[in-house]
């Protein structure tokens, strides 16, 4: 279910402050965050945000097509390596 329109999109306060500070300075710097639930807003476009996936921070460059999505959507937490092979020779 989507978030109610009368509420604003959720963005962590510390992340919003860092974005605003970099926008006023017009600098580009990697922003490290653990806030996977934050929504990408238009002021984040053009920045690189390192999103935590449970083990490490993955640097993600924010484009205009990502606006409205959550940060966690772009940092997968598990890696599927395929199903176990059915090798009958090793069972004998």
UniProtKB/Swiss-Prot annotation:
Protein's cellular compartments: Plastid, Chloroplast
GO biological process: translation
An example Gene Ontology molecular-function term: structural constituent of ribosome
Protein origin, superkingdom: Eukaryota
Alphabetically ordered keywords of this record: Chloroplast, Plastid, Ribonucleoprotein, Ribosomal protein, RNA-binding, rRNA-binding
Pfam families recorded: Ribosomal_S19
Keyword Membrane: no
SUPFAM superfamilies (alphabetical): Ribosomal protein S19
InterPro entries attached to this UniProt entry: Ribosomal_uS19 (IPR002222), Ribosomal_uS19_bac-type (IPR005732), Ribosomal_uS19_CS (IPR020934), Ribosomal_uS19_SF (IPR023575)
GO cellular-component term (any): small ribosomal subunit
PROSITE patterns given in the database record: RIBOSOMAL_S19
Function of the protein: Protein S19 forms a complex with S13 that binds strongly to the 16S ribosomal RNA.
PANTHER family reported in the protein's UniProt record: RIBOSOMAL PROTEIN S19P FAMILY MEMBER, SMALL RIBOSOMAL SUBUNIT PROTEIN US19M
Family: Belongs to the universal ribosomal protein uS19 family.
UniProt protein name: Small ribosomal subunit protein uS19c
Annotated source species: Citrus sinensis
Gene name as annotated: rps19
């Amino acid at each position: 279910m989507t978030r109610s329109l009368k509420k604003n999109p959720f963005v962590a306060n510390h992340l919003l402050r860092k974005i605003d500070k970099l926008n006023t300075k017009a600098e580009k710097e990697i922003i490290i965050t653990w806030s996977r639930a934050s929504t990408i807003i238009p002021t984040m476009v053009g920045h690189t945000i390192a999103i935590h996936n449970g083990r490490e921070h993955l640097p993600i460059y924010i484009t205009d097509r990502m606006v409205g999505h959550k940060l966690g959507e772009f940092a997968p937490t598990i890696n599927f390596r395929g199903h176990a092979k059915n090798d009958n020779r090793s069972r004998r």
